Amino acid sequence: MSVLPCSINTLKGIYDLSGVEVGQHFYWQIGGFQVHAQVLITSWVVIAILLGSATIVVRNPQTIPTDGQNFFEYVLEFIRDLTKTQIGEEEYGPWVPFIGTMFLFIFVSNWSGALLPRKIIELPQGELAAPTNDINTTVALALPTSVAYFYAGISKKGLGYFGKYIQPTPILLPINILEDFTKPLSLSFRLFGNILADELVVVVLVSLVPSLVPIPVMFLGLFTSGIQALIFATLAAAYIGESMEGHH
C-alpha cells in the first residue's frame, strides 16, 4: 500500500473543501483573490467582542473581584482544567492559551450565528452567519491543531516521536499515518456540519411557521453550539496530550 499518495490525496481533499458553498455568498476581490466577506465580517465582530470584553473587565483587576472578573476567572479555570485533564498536569501549562483561544473563538462564533441580528449589516448578497458554518473557517481552525500536536510530539520526543507509527506492529504504519492526516478532516467536518445544519433548520422553520415556534429550536441550537466548541477544544487537547504520551 502506498502511503504517500494516500496522504497527498487526503490533503488535497481538505484543500478542495475550501470551494464548498452553501447558499448565497458575498465576496470581496482583494488583488487576485476572492475573499468570503460574510465570514470575515462576522469573524471581526467575534474577535472584537472577545478582545473588547476581556480588556474592559480585566484591565483593572480588583482584590475583591467584580462580577465580570469572576466570570472571566471561571472561564479561565474551566479551560485550564480541561487542558490539564487531556494533556496532563506536567505538560498542560503552555497549551492553555492555545486551547483557550480555540474554545472561545469557536464558542462565540457558533453563538453569533443565532444571536447576532442577521440584518444588522446589509450585504449585497446573502446575510451574516456564524463563521463556523463555512468550511474554510473550520479547516483554518483544524490545521493549526494538527501542527500543534505534531510540534508537541516532536518537541517532547524528538525524532523518536515517529516511532509511534510502527507500534504495536509495523504492518499498521499506513493506518497510523492516515489517522494523523485525517484528524483535521474529522475536526473540520464535525464542526462545519453541525453548525450549518443548525442554522439551516432555524432558517427553514422561521420561513415556514410563526416567529415564536422556532424559539425552542434556537435555544437547542445554542446548547449544541456550545457543546461543539467544547468537543473541538477537548479533542484538540487530547490529540496534543496523545502526541506527547505516545501511541495508545
Swiss-Prot record:
Cellular-component GO terms for this entry: chloroplast thylakoid membrane; plasma membrane; proton-transporting ATP synthase complex
Membrane protein topology class: Multi-pass membrane protein
Protein name according to UniProt: ATP synthase subunit a, chloroplastic
Function according to Swiss-Prot or TrEMBL: Key component of the proton channel; it plays a direct role in the translocation of protons across the membrane.
Family: Belongs to the ATPase A chain family.
Keywords carried by this UniProt record: ATP synthesis, CF(0), Chloroplast, Hydrogen ion transport, Ion transport, Membrane, Plastid, Thylakoid, Transmembrane, Transmembrane helix, Transport
Xref: NCBIfam families: ATP_synt_6_or_A (TIGR01131)
MF term (GO), any: proton-transporting ATP synthase activity, rotational mechanism
InterPro entries: ATP_syn_F0_a_bact/chloroplast, ATP_synth_F0_asu, ATP_synth_F0_asu_AS, F0_ATP_A_sf
Subunit structure: F-type ATPases have 2 components, CF(1) - the catalytic core - and CF(0) - the membrane proton channel. CF(1) has five subunits: alpha(3), beta(3), gamma(1), delta(1), epsilon(1). CF(0) has four main subunits: a, b, b' and c.
Segments crossing the lipid bilayer: 38-58, 96-116, 135-155, 200-220, 221-241
Location of this chain's protein in the cell: Plastid, Chloroplast thylakoid membrane
Domain of life from the UniProt record: Eukaryota
